[in-house]
Structures are given as structure tokens and as C-alpha cells.
Amino acid sequence: MRSNLCHPLKNQLPISFFLSGTIRKPIFSCSRLSISAIITKEQTQEESESKSKKEVAFSSSSSFDFKAYMIGKANSVNKALEDAVLVREPLKIHESMRYSLLAGGKRVRPMLCIAACELFGGTESVAMPSACAVEMIHTMSLMHDDLPCMDNDDLRRGKPTNHKVFGEDVAVLAGDALLAFAFEHIATATKGVSSERIVRVVGELAKCIGSEGLVAGQVVDVCSEGIADVGLEHLEFIHIHKTAALLEGSVVLGAIVGGANDEQISKLRKFARCIGLLFQVVDDILDVTKSSQELGKTAGKDLVADKVTYPKLLGIDKSREFAEKLNREAQEQLAEFDPEKAAPLIALANYIAYRDN
């Protein structure tokens, strides 16, 4: 059994559906430490557990100005996205693409990509095409997730969802266009990186969003609706793939274009896997503790849809405890790197853990 949760999956978890009229709960076999094992595991670091959130959040680098870093990187990403996706013919499809892509958002994935690149001596400009690509794909996933055939949501980033403004047909096509353009942008806009590493970036990104990544998580999520006995390992499978995979890809892409070696990339994968799950745990907590106005999207929708979430299975307190564990384990993966260069990644992990929306 592995000693921690966040090792990347060498082999995807086996999953079986029985499609004779109804879909039954997926059956998993997994040798690694599960969420339930972590949650019920006897505490061995009571002193660490008693730290306040504030102490944990700022123990990494008191001199690092994360607010300034976040504003600066978000502005750079927003400008790069606006320059990449221009208004051109056909107007409607490009307006739809830009409507969702430029609607704001935290830009966490692009920042992770840039920070990972800079950790290994790369520059923002080297990472930016990959950073923009992951944000394009993230936006596509939100556009498709909001459709009536999926979550049927009306609000995203404080604005009407794309299909409410442009119609379902255009929203689907605009999402498809963003997906395709993401790969084109990496291939044509990345400068100062070897062709071998660019090919590796394309393969990495494709895998993390396909049938072994984001799509896998989404289809299991959709097929799990109405199943009463969904457990923690089932939920973990969904979110490792649906949420964590693209966050992992964001970090790994940055590491690749930044010049990291395989051992360093492996460390960053483990870090990213932890913060990917962390992102979802916090999302689930916020969904039941914040309003739609505070979140900028429909609050409580998982509860209404009777979806399984971490608070539903663990309760709010245990979910928060699990989030703390994931954050600590994520930061442990960065212990061997230069603290000054790792400060943005540590700060981003803390931001994900303690965000309010």
C-alpha cells in the first residue's frame, strides 16, 4: 500500500458498468490509500493538526507577496487570452468563445502552469501558450458542463451561461472550437522550447482531458446520478479525473516547458494531484456554505441534484480536515526545491485551500 494519497495513477482504476437496463455502481479495485483510509487513520501528528489555518497558510514564505503575484499573472493571462482569440468571422462562434473565455475567473490553472515553469528557470512567456491552452480547455469543460444535457446551469462566473446567451448549438460548437484551438496555440505559439518537449506537452494535455482524464470523470459522474450507495473510492475516481486531471496537466505542462527532468516532473505530479483533489473538496464545501452571489455560480446545485459530494459523505468538519491533509501533503512534495522559487506554488496551494469562492 502506498504511503500517501497523491501519487499519480500508473494504471487507471478499473471500472465496470453493467448496462442491462440500469447502470450499477462502478466496481473498483485499488491498492493505494483511499480517502476513507486517510480520514479514519489515527492521527500521529497532533501538534501539526492543531495549527491554525492562518499559521499553515503563511508558514511557507512570509515575504512572498501572493496578492501582487496573482494580480500580475491574472492580468498577463487575460491579455494573452484576449490576443489569442480574436473577433473574426464567423462572428457568432468567436463571440461565444470570447464570452466565456474572457468572463473572468480565478485563472488558477494558468498560474499553476506559469509557476511550475518558473520553478525550473523558465519564463512566463515560455509558459504562456500552454497556460492559455489549459484555460481554454477548462472554459470548454465549463461550457459543456452547464448544458441542459449535463448540469443544466444558468449562471457561471456571475453571468448567464453560454448556452443561455448564444443557444445550445453554438455553445457546443464554441466549446469544441476552444478545445481544438488550445492544441493549435501550443503548437504555433510556443517559443524557445524543443519540438520534443512540445510533442510531450501535447500528449500530456490530450491524455488528461480524454477518456483517461476529464471525460472519464464526467461520464462516471453522469452515470452515478440516482445511485444511492456511492462510496468514497467512487467519488475519488470521479474527481481525480474530472477535476484533478486538468490541474495536474497544468502543472506538468509548465514543468515540461520549463525544462524539468523526469524525477522533478514526478514530484510536481504528486503535488498537482493533491491540490486537484483539494480544489474539489473545497468546491464541495463552498457549494453548501456560500450563496450564489458569493460564488458567482449556482450554489447548492449538487444538493438539489442529489449528487454525492465530500460533505455529504464525510460531513463538513471531516471534509475540512481532509482538505488540510491534502494541502500538507501537496506542500511536502515541494520540500526539496528552492523555497523562493517554490513560493508561488505553495501560495497557490494555500489559496486553493482557503479560498471563499
From Swiss-Prot:
One of its GO terms (biological process) is geranyl diphosphate biosynthetic process. Dimethylallyl diphosphate binds at residues 156, 242-243, 280, 297, 307. Binds 2 Mg(2+) ions per subunit. Coiled coil: none annotated. Isopentenyl diphosphate binds at residues 106, 109, 138, 157. Its main location: plastid. One of its GO terms (molecular function) is dimethylallyltranstransferase activity. Its cofactor is Mg(2+). Its EC number is 2.5.1.-, 2.5.1.1, 2.5.1.29, 2.5.1.10. Keywords: Carotenoid biosynthesis, Chloroplast, Isoprene biosynthesis, Magnesium, Metal-binding, Plastid, Transferase, Transit peptide. It catalyses: isopentenyl diphosphate + dimethylallyl diphosphate = (2E)-geranyl diphosphate + diphosphate; isopentenyl diphosphate + (2E)-geranyl diphosphate = (2E,6E)-farnesyl diphosphate + diphosphate; isopentenyl diphosphate + (2E,6E)-farnesyl diphosphate = (2E,6E,10E)-geranylgeranyl diphosphate + diphosphate. Pfam families: polyprenyl_synt (PF00348). It comes from the Eukaryota. Mg(2+) 2 binds at residues 145, 151. Mg(2+) 1 binds at residues 145, 151. GO terms for cellular component: chloroplast. Pathway: Isoprenoid biosynthesis; farnesyl diphosphate biosynthesis; farnesyl diphosphate from geranyl diphosphate and isopentenyl diphosphate: step 1/1; Isoprenoid biosynthesis; geranyl diphosphate biosynthesis; geranyl diphosphate from dimethylallyl diphosphate and isopentenyl diphosphate: step 1/1; Isoprenoid biosynthesis; geranylgeranyl diphosphate biosynthesis; geranylgeranyl diphosphate from farnesyl diphosphate and isopentenyl diphosphate: step 1/1. Residues 1-40 form a transit peptide. It is found in: Plastid, Chloroplast. Catalyzes the trans-addition of the three molecules of IPP onto DMAPP to form geranylgeranyl pyrophosphate. Belongs to the FPP/GGPP synthase family. This is Geranylgeranyl pyrophosphate synthase, chloroplastic. It comes from Catharanthus roseus (Madagascar periwinkle). The gene is GGPS1.
